[in-house]
């Protein structure tokens, strides 16, 4: 019977030329993420590796590139709303998602009717002791954005 250990990530650092290329492509993806909520979280995770990009980050960046090639026609359509719309907010968190620092990731979206007004995915500033605490911080962030 085989071992159920998680596969090791390739922690080999990229050469200086490859690291410069990685940073340039990740920066372009970060610019693109402002209009594409479907890639925002992935780009945020890729930008964590900007200081010392590794082969694992390079493979993740290539995977994002393949996703963008396959979904290049993804657009956000805004339709005329004939009725009054209410503003709603949704939030979620990933408790202790950062394996290095143990910090959680918060994400959320603010909508008015069917239109996106704002969306985000950010690492929380503090280490939380439970998933409920991480959710509460995400809820407070969403409430602040609504106001």
Regions found by a protein language model. Give the residues of each.
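Divalent metal-binding acidic/histidine catalytic loops
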Residues: 1-147
């Amino acid at each position: 019977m085989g071992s159920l250990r998680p596969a090791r990530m390739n922690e080999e650092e990229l050469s200086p030329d490859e690291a410069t290329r990685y940073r340039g492509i990740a920066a372009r993806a970060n610019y693109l993420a402002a209009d594409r909520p479907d890639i925002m979280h992935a780009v945020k995770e890729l930008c964590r590796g900007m200081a010392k990009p590794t082969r694992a980050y390079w493979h993740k960046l290539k995977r994002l590139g393949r996703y963008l090639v396959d979904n290049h026609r993804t657009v956000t359509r805004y339709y005329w709303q004939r009725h009054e719309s209410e503003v709603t907010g949704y939030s979620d968190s990933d408790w202790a998602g950062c394996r290095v620092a143990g910090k959680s990731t918060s994400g959320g979206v603010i909508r008015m009717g069917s239109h996106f007004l704002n969306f985000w995915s950010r690492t929380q500033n503090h280490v939380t002791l439970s998933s409920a605490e991480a959710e509460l911080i995400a809820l407070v962030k969403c409430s602040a954005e609504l106001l």
